[in-house]
């Protein structure tokens, strides 16, 4: 099992659907939601130099994350965009790349999974769900890796 080449590249956030509603359902207050929505987001997905390992970067105007040399199906710990330490697992199944996070400071209530696909416009589409609210975010490819 490996991540297909079509996922590798640099992507910039283009548009979102139900993002404010999604954040609200997670208890994020109005002011913080506005700050999050204003922050640009670039995602970079690439192969690592080591065979079978990958990298993902999230670049924002506030904070960056850089997950290096992860393997599909293997847990690792790293800081999330919220500044907390997370247990993270990436997986790939049925043409969907998933990114599962558990905040180590609240493992019982903090599980989140992000699902990534490549649409027919060659955009990275991220899907998240909470309390029945489905959020999608589209990222335009700005360069091939």
UniProtKB/Swiss-Prot annotation:
Q: Which gene encodes it?
A: lbp-4
Q: Which Gene3D superfamilies does UniProt cross-reference here?
A: 2.40.128.20
Matching entries from InterPro entries are given as: Calycin (IPR012674), Fatty_acid-bd (IPR000463), Lbp1-4 (IPR040094)
In Swiss-Prot or TrEMBL terms, this protein is called Fatty acid-binding protein homolog 4
Source species of the chain: Caenorhabditis elegans
- Recorded family membership: Belongs to the calycin superfamily. Fatty-acid binding protein (FABP) family.
An annotated Gene Ontology molecular function: lipid binding
Supply the alphabetized keyword list: Lipid-binding, Transport
């Amino acid at each position: 099992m490996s991540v297909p080449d079509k996922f590798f590249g640099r992507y910039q956030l283009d548009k979102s659907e139900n993002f404010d509603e999604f954040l609200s359902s997670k208890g994020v207050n109005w002011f913080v939601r506005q700050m999050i929505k204003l922050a640009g987001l670039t995602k970079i997905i690439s192969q690592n130099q080591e065979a079978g390992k990958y990298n993902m970067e999230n670049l924002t105007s506030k904070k960056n994350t850089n997950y290096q040399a992860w393997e599909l199906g293997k847990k690792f710990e790293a800081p999330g965009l919220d500044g907390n330490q997370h247990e993270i697992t990436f997986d790939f199944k049925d043409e969907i790349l998933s990114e599962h996070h558990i905040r180590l400071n609240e493992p019982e209530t903090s599980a989140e999974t992000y699902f990534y696909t490549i649409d027919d416009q060659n955009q990275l589409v991220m899907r998240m769900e909470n309390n029945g609210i489905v959020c999608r975010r589209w990222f335009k490819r700005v360069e091939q890796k």
